[in-house]
Amino acid sequence: MKYELIREIYNKCSGNQMRDVFISNPDTDDPEEYVRDMLKGKLVKIEKEVFPDGTVIIDADVAGLQQRFTFSPD
């Protein structure tokens, strides 16, 4: 399935509330596996939420660095 993916990497610095944002259009049948593959080799804790419209939000704690992956059906 084709998705629009918005990846947000939250800044740990308390004085800087900006975050890095990346947009791509992956083709995957399993968004969680796609994220795990992207973060392979790192210590990762993942929480996943699936919405009725097909949107999948995956919050990942990557060794203390928070990232959010929002997959929206394309």
What spans do the regions from the language model cover?
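N-terminal acidic leader/helix
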Residues: K2-E32
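Generic N-terminal initiation segments characterized by hydrophobic and/or small/turn-forming residues
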Residues: K2-Y3, V35-R36, K40, V62
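Surface-exposed beta-strand edges and their flanking turn/coil or helix-capping segments
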Residues: M18-D20, R36-L39, F71-P73
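A short, charged, amphipathic alpha-helix used as a generic interaction element across diverse proteins
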Residues: D29-E47
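Short, mixed-charge low-complexity intrinsically disordered segments
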Residues: G41-D74
